[in-house]
């Protein structure tokens, strides 16, 4: 098993690795909508927050020589599920190639770190 911290990756909000790799699978820790340059500072609204979360996930994957095309499963956590679900889906969908959407679970939660509106974690598979 390998524990990865990606140089230049998002600043952890708690004690964890950016990703853990075992048996060809890479488990990417849930990412927040802040940026490595502005830890703890979140943009307003689900559109900007979803974009930042996806950018952070891409950064972690790229640091491990992977991309979104290697993702087999995504889990999305929303604090305002009813209000933000449709817009989050529009932004989320824009990051994936046609016909290459991973399996996904999306749930409403009562709270996230930094009072974020969204968090996403991934499972990827090495080719």
Question: PLM features: residue spans?
Answer:
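N-terminal presequence-like segments and the immediate start of the first folded domain
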Residues: 1-55, 59-72, 78-127
